[in-house]
Amino acid sequence: MSELFHHIATRPADLVAGWRDGAPVSHGAWLARVRAWAALGARTPGARVALFHDDSLEFAAALLGAWLSGKTVWLSADTLPASCAALGQAVDAFWGQFPPAHAPGAPGPQDAWEGAIVAPAPDHPAVVVFTSGSTGQPAPIPKRLAQLLDEVAALQAQFGAGLEGAAVLATVSHQHIYGLLFRILWPLAAGRAIHAARHEFP
């Protein structure tokens, strides 16, 4: 259960964590962003934050930072007014690239959380995702940390052997559960480089 967080805490700082605009992002630089978001979480009142960010590396840092500071992350597929209004009824703060009217939070230069990188409890309410809404209003679905990491372990067991050294590009947004698993959590657990931008297809 704690392997994801152990790997994140102990990987060499010069390891390539991902790519942004064709340039490598080191694990050390990315981990500093995790700590910055965790510091924001530590000073953000409430337990529930809505997170939206196009950049997969920054999204991953914010997600881990939220968990380290005890937050539950609510994911939205978009930042349309109706989506933001619904989130506003459920969360205590908005993080990332939401419209300015929602005062989205982001770490400041002073934010540098110094706590240990350790896993929250397995039953920590890690994320809330939404159904597509194709048959009615989108419905929130909570996921515990153990559920997410069990799915990641299953993916690694089934497909991981042939993917050593692979970098991860994705067409599915990490704001959705499949993108969250395949584009963010599985690569983080396995030490694969993440591309910050979404791969547009075709």
Each predicted region: which residue ranges?
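Conserved AMP-binding/adenylate-forming
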Residues: 39-79, 166-174
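AMP-binding/adenylate-forming
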Residues: 89-99, 142-158, 163-202
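Conserved pre-ATP/AMP-binding loop-to-beta segment of ANL
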Residues: 9-13, 112-130, 161-168
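Conserved AMP-binding A3 loop
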Residues: 24-28, 118, 124-153
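A short N-terminal helical cap/helix-turn-helix that marks the beginning
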Residues: 1-16
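Conserved AMP-binding/adenylate-forming core of the ANL superfamily
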Residues: 14-43, 143-146
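ATP-dependent adenylate-forming carboxylate-activation enzymes
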Residues: 53, 74-87, 192-202
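Flexible, low-complexity linker/hinge segments
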Residues: 99-125, 151-152, 157
